[in-house]
Amino acid sequence: MRPPAFWFTPPDSPALAARLLAPLGQAYAAATARRLRAPGHRAGVPVICIGNLNAGGTGKTPTAIALMQRLAARGIEAHVVSRGYGGRLEGPVEVDARRHRAADVGDEPLLLAAFGRAWVARDRAAGVRAAEAAGAQAILLDDGFQNPSVVKDLSLIVVDAAVGFGNGRCLPAGPLREPVEAGLARADLLLSIGGPEAQRRFATDWPALPVPRLTGRLATLQMGMDWQGARVLAFAGIGRPEKFFASLRAEGAELLRAEALDDHQPLGEALMKRLEIEAMALGAQLVTTEKDAVRLPPSFRQKVLTLPVRLEFDDATALDAALDRLGLAARS
């Protein structure tokens, strides 16, 4: 399901639907606050939570990849622990791309496993214990900011600068899992992802936030593919597929058709065959995201191109300082 438009009206002028649903949003926020009072497991290694306040995609996966690579460059073996949304395995189990599929462990953990060791566990505390026992020197929690089962040593909140915190209301009246003020009071860093205009708008709409702010953008990873003038049929089942389509256009591709799928939507044979027939009729190449690509049926993996993106920080000084404080300085 796509999020309703009224979630993203200005906070000072909420839509009628948001006002009508406000009591339910307040109840949701109260339930979250009660849940967060529960005690959590404290690991023997630093735990870094990559979370968000909004429901849906904000850029956590590229942020996790960037942190894995940053810690690896410091000589730190970081393991990712994910709940494995969309997968059938309860875990804790280490993701193995040679034997696991997205239907087993979820698409995000399968993608993250290409960059380091990743675990899936419905019980996050059990996943953290398993990762620590397997030699993790640091643990990245993929999501879980609103889950108290694991004590976090550093919480990094990720927000899409283009949409900010929406109308500032909690589910179902808005996109938030908890109020902005309450969430940021527990956070250590805020990362807003987007281009210059989106960053300026975010800073205007959400000024004076009580947490150090990092900024960054998603940049296309150059793989030798010349997209200029390429005729493509693009499809994406991510939080905001329009960002992927915009990236293709920015690379110069001729986007003949854009199919926005639901986040984590299964890519079955029937759907892929339909898209293949449409692409052939248009004389277009099928293109998708890295995260969607791990859900492709085996028969389509050689037929679909991907446009990989990576997070680039504008200034990571505050992040590096936070990692140093956790004892994760570069090791020889």
UniProtKB/Swiss-Prot annotation:
GO terms for biological process: lipid A biosynthetic process; lipopolysaccharide core region biosynthetic process. It is an enzyme of class 2 (transferase). The gene is lpxK. ATP binds at N54, A55, G56, G57, T58, G59, K60, T61. One of its GO terms (cellular component) is plasma membrane. It catalyses: a lipid A disaccharide + ATP = a lipid IVA + ADP + H(+). Transfers the gamma-phosphate of ATP to the 4'-position of a tetraacyldisaccharide 1-phosphate intermediate (termed DS-1-P) to form tetraacyldisaccharide 1,4'-bis-phosphate (lipid IVA). One of its GO terms (molecular function) is ATP binding. This is Tetraacyldisaccharide 4'-kinase. The lineage of its organism: Bacteria, Pseudomonadati, Pseudomonadota, Alphaproteobacteria, Rhodobacterales. InterPro entries: LpxK, P-loop_NTPase. Keywords: ATP-binding, Kinase, Lipid A biosynthesis, Lipid biosynthesis, Lipid metabolism, Nucleotide-binding, Transferase. Pathway: Glycolipid biosynthesis; lipid IV(A) biosynthesis; lipid IV(A) from (3R)-3-hydroxytetradecanoyl-[acyl-carrier-protein] and UDP-N-acetyl-alpha-D-glucosamine: step 6/6. Its EC number is 2.7.1.130. Pfam families: LpxK. Disulfide bonds: none annotated. Belongs to the LpxK family.
